[in-house]
Swiss-Prot record:
Gene Ontology biological process terms from the UniProt entry: cell division; proteolysis involved in protein catabolic process
Binding site for Zn(2+): 13, 16, 35, 38
Residues in ClpX-type ZB domain copies: 1-54
UniProt record similarity statement: Belongs to the ClpX chaperone family.
Subunit (UniProt): Component of the ClpX-ClpP complex. Forms a hexameric ring that, in the presence of ATP, binds to fourteen ClpP subunits assembled into a disk-like structure with a central cavity, resembling the structure of eukaryotic proteasomes.
Biological role: ATP-dependent specificity component of the Clp protease. It directs the protease to specific substrates. Can perform chaperone functions in the absence of ClpP.
GO cellular-component term (any): HslUV protease complex
SMART domains xrefs: AAA, ClpB_D2-small, zf-C4_ClpX
Protein name (Swiss-Prot/TrEMBL): ATP-dependent Clp protease ATP-binding subunit ClpX
Length: 425
């Protein structure tokens, strides 16, 4: 009930009791009045509450061990890389949170480089990290980037992808993660600075420097090149975590040459010839990246280096079966929808892993191998209701004309490439 001063015939604020003469503005509502001073006070209270909630969200970032445990559910192996990434990501978002205070100590930004062969899990690790932290995530291919003014994508277009992933919420995008793949492809051709213009190599590294370090970038809302009189989205990259990744083919030889200089003599126990590719990659240093072709300024902006080892047969089999979204589980789900049980024999899984190693495709090649094996069966099964089980054997994978074994509901067993019996009415 609103307050009314009967003696003077004046309305009063329902919250503080001040009359309309004592305040600048009195806003009327259904049966109540509120003055401008109470409105300001309410606004401050709401802003403080929302600000506290945001800080709480930042404080609820999983601890490094918790991040690593979640990564274990989706990514097989690469324990050292997962540990390094978990610590780096946790520290990055601690830094973001600490920046809100007035502390004189400013924590430097720590972007991450991931070095490892194709199919070792670089992209999956970056995607999973973004899901764990629940921040916008964007992925870009360094090979499509060129220096500003040349044919190709400007580096600002990477930021546009992140803004789009955040539904154009710039404030949210400013705390996101960007993964730049194939960064090794923009390495310059030699250690020495290029005399000629290298617009897709060293030029791209130079163009990336500012956004890696932290700057307010102007991004064209529709992408493409910048034009005069165009509206831009302003985004601060200071708190965006950049993860760059690449196979860096041949860097193991660079590391081997560096180690070779240190093992000459009778006192050395571990010679570089005894180290495999994975062990060599684990010893990578910034100076190796410099020799490979990354410029010193670029290396200085990615202080955290994580190496991923090539996946062996055992790891590939685990990738097929262990993670929550394992490939075998995915295909079993697809067959289950058609009321058919899909079964992989242990020897079949071993053969699939061997094929992936032979093709040097790592985990990335597993899906195409399985798809090639069962595509004919997936074509026929949806049209039939008499198939009970589909079994993938060693011969199915190893033989050129291998085919899955089909078990029918009447007990009949046939190979998928045999002429199938007509379905009974």
């Amino acid at each position: 009930m609103f307050k009314f001063n009967e003696e003077k015939g004046q309305l009063k604020c329902s919250f503080c009791g001040k009359s309309q003469e004592q305040v600048r503005k009195l806003v009327a509502g259904p049966g109540v009045y509120i003055c401008d001073e109470c409105i300001d006070l309410c606004t401050e209270i709401v802003e403080e509450e929302l600000g506290t909630e945001e800080d709480m969200e930042m404080n609820e970032i999983p601890k490094p061990k918790e991040i690593c445990d979640i990564l274990d559910d989706y990514v097989i192996g690469q324990d050292k890389a997962k540990k390094n990434l978990s610590v780096a990501v946790y520290n990055h978002y601690k830094r973001v949170n600490s920046g809100k205070g007035n502390d004189e100590v400013e924590i430097a930004k720590s972007n991450i480089a991931m070095i490892g062969p194709t199919g070792s899990g670089k992209t999956l690790l970056a995607q999973t990290l973004a899901r764990i932290i629940n921040v916008p995530f964007a992925m870009a291919d360094a090979t499509s980037l060129t220096e500003a003014g040349y044919v190709g994508e400007d580096v600002e277009n990477i930021l546009l992808k992140l803004i789009q992933a955040a539904d154009y919420d710039v404030e949210k995008a400013e705390k996101g993660i960007i993964y730049i793949d194939e960064i090794d492809k923009v390495a310059r051709k030699s250690e020495n600075p290029s005399i000629t213009r290298d617009v897709s190599g060293e030029g791209v590294q130079q163009a990336l420097l500012k956004i890696l370090e932290g700057t307010v970038a102007s991004v064209p809302p529709q992408g493409g090149r910048k034009h005069p009189h165009q509206e831009f989205i302003q985004i601060d990259t200071t708190n965006i975590l950049f993860i760059v990744g690449g196979a860096f083919d041949g860097i193991d030889q660079v590391i081997k040459r560096r180690l070779g200089k240190k093992v000459i003599g009778f006192g050395s126990h571990e010679k570089q010839e005894d180290l495999d590719t994975g062990q060599l990659l684990s010893k990578v240093l910034p100076e190796d990246l410099l020799r490979y072709g990354l410029i010193p300024e670029f290396i200085g902006r990615i202080p955290v280096i994580g190496s991923l080892t090539p996946l062996d047969e055992e790891a590939l089999i685990e990738i097929l079966t262990k993670p929550k979204n394992a490939l075998v589980k995915q295909y079993q789900k697809l067959f289950e929808i058609d009321h058919v049980e899909l079964e992989f024999e242990e020897e079949a899984l071993q053969e699939i892993a061997k094929k992936a190693i032979e093709r040097k495709t790592g985990a990335r090649g597993l899906r195409s191998i399985i798809e090639g094996i069962i595509v004919d069966v997936m074509f026929d099964i949806p049209s039939r209701e008499d198939v009970d089980r589909c079994i993938i054997t060693k011969e199915t994978v190893s033989d050129d004309d291998g085919s899955p074994k089909l078990v029918f509901r009447d007990g009949t067993v046939k190979l998928g490439n045999e002429k199938l019996p007509k379905e009974s009415a």
